[in-house]
Each structure stands twice: as structure tokens, then as C-alpha cells.
């Protein structure tokens, strides 16, 4: 059994303001309560396959300590389960994960929801033809 790459290096963190702005303007989304994934396809050279950011709204958790806990939880569940995306996808994406509820879910519940969200994202990507596929027809 080979060990999956369960790292979350600096290059994979979504930090570029231009990409984040583009994500909110033209991004598509997939939801699996209480998580939401907003993404865009990236065609740039030298960027990793997935660049990911996380966000927890002040609307749901007033204390920074609570927001930071759920951001840490999202990053950890992404890191442990990103192999589901890497194994299935060959395109590059910039994506943002949102935690959208006041409910205080534990790690196992968030991980289960994250896996469901990734499966939904993969199905959506396999169902949508790309621009290059449309040009070939």
C-alpha cells in the first residue's frame, strides 16, 4: 500500500488577490451542507493542480478563536482527503472552502461532509464538457 501525499504546502495555499477576486466574480460553486466550494479553472503554467483557501464567516462565529478552529478543521480535512481530487482530476483549479453554519460539527462529521463535497465536485466536472471538447466537435 502506497502512502498518499497528505501535505498542504505553501504553493497550494490560495493567496493571490487577483485569483481570489476572480473566484468571487466568475467562480462556480458546489455545496454539501454545511460546506460550500467555490472554484475556477486555472490555465497558468507553474501553478499547482489545486490552490485552496478556507473561510469561516464572522456571521456564524463571533469569536476569532472559534473561526480559527473551524478554518484549521477545514484545512486538515482538505489535506487528508485531497487525494480524492488529485486522483480523479487532471485540470488545475483555484478553490475556496466555506463553512456555512452555526452548528458546531466535530472532525468526523466535517470530514464526511468534505468527502461528499469532493465527490459532488468530481461528478460535476465529469458531467460538464470543457471548452476544448466543444471546439473538437
Task: Label each residue range with its predicted role.
Residues 1-137:
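Positively charged, solvent-exposed patches that mediate nucleic-acid binding
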